[in-house]
């Protein structure tokens, strides 16, 4: 299944655009290979996502089923493109990097729940962003953070936002 097929009328050219919106956390500071960037649930990894995009999803237009779908839509030829959006999160305000990443990518920080709780009363400046709103960055509509919601980070990662629209993940200590 194609994410997007579009036609550039000025160039008279059709494109197959694959889209991915992901959030990855650096396992530690410093230079990292893509396999060291984990999704919030730790099952997803940046290297695997990129491999799937490049070796499977971008190749859809070259498969027999993809060729048939294009033919049915009246498209003879299309050029594949990929667009990856989202954010990369760094451990406790430390920097990490990987060759091939846009140096201007959106960033945030991540904290273990124990360290986050030690940040005096500063953590009450944050609000909880439920997963459907991770891209939204809307502080006013995010849920005010209370102890019960913060306790959720003992079990699974949660994304928070502050009034400066900075986002962070708080993750279990283990």
Predicted stretch roles:
Residues 1-174:
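Intrinsically disordered, low-complexity Ser/Thr/Pro/Gly-rich regulatory segments
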């Amino acid at each position: 299944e194609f994410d997007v097929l579009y036609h550039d009328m000025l160039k008279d050219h059709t494109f197959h655009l694959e889209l991915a919106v992901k959030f990855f956390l650096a396992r530690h500071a410093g230079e990292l290979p893509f396999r060291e960037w984990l999704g919030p649930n730790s099952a997803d990894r940046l290297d695997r996502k990129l491999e799937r995009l490049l070796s499977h999803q971008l190749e859809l237009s070259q498969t027999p089923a993809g060729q048939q779908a294009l033919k049915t839509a009246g498209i003879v030829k299309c050029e594949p493109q990929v667009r990856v959006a989202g954010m990369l999160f760094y451990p406790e305000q430390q920097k990490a990097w990987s060759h091939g990443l846009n140096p201007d990518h959106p960033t945030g920080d991540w904290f273990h729940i124990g360290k986050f709780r030690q940040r005096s009363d500063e953590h009450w400046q944050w609000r909880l962003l439920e997963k459907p709103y991770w891209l939204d960055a809307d502080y006013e509509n995010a849920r005010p953070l209370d102890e019960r919601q913060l306790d959720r980070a003992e079990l699974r990662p949660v994304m928070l936002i502050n009034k400066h629209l900075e986002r962070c993940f708080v993750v279990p200590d283990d």
